[in-house]
């Protein structure tokens, strides 16, 4: 198994050195949006990581990463790592949309579950389909907004 990491962010030297000791990690840098779609389609598991820093948690606590919707649309297993008080992780866990971990022990446990085929992919796929059609469908969202605005104007 190999973890390919695509990122535009500059990695600290210490992190680069730590990664260099692990043969199953490969830093790939950034890619075009067209390449991203191909990479997502070819992947077995898509990994989403939220920062544990207090500042990042404060900044992202109520947001939901659009990258996660892209991951859901790719139809692949999502493995999300980060603090559970961040909306993205909370939503993924509460709606059974991804495998989640919020500490090192959980990361190890979940990686082993993925590796050993112990993940209920049918349940995840069904949950993703339900979530996308219920909460991310453009027509449904527009209809709800129209109804709310109509009520306000009465």
Language model features with spans:
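CheY-like receiver
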Residues: 39-42, 110-114, 148
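A charged, aromatic-enriched C-terminal amphipathic alpha-helix characteristic of glycosyltransferases
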Residues: 102-108, 118-150
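Conserved acidic donor-binding segment of nucleotide-sugar-dependent glycosyltransferases
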Residues: 65, 83, 95-105, 114-119
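Nucleotide-activated donor-binding/catalytic signature segment of Leloir-type glycosyltransferases, i.e.
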Residues: 2-7, 12-42, 55
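Nucleotide-sugar-dependent
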Residues: 34-39, 46-72, 78-90
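Hydrophobic/aromatic beta-strand patches that form the interior of the parallel beta-sheet core
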Residues: 4, 28, 45-47, 79, ...
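Short, well-ordered coil/turn elements that cap or connect secondary structure elements
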Residues: 19-22, 73, 93-94
């Amino acid at each position: 198994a190999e973890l390919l990491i695509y990122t535009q962010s500059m990695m600290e030297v210490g992190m680069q050195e730590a990664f260099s000791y692990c043969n199953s990690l490969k830093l790939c840098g950034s890619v075009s949006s067209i390449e991203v779609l191909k990479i997502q389609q070819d992947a077995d598991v898509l990994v989403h990581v939220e920062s544990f820093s207090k500042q990042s948690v404060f900044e992202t606590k109520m947001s939901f990463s659009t990258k996660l919707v892209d991951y859901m649309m790719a139809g692949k297993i999502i493995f999300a790592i980060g603090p559970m008080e961040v909306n993205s992780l909370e939503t993924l866990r509460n709606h059974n949309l991804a495998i989640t971990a919020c500490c090192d022990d959980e990361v190890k446990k979940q990686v082993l579950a993925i590796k050993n085929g112990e993940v209920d992919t049918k349940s995840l796929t069904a949950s993703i389909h339900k979530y996308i059609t219920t909460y991310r469908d453009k027509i449904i969202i527009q209809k709800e907004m129209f109804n709310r605005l109509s009520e306000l104007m009465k």
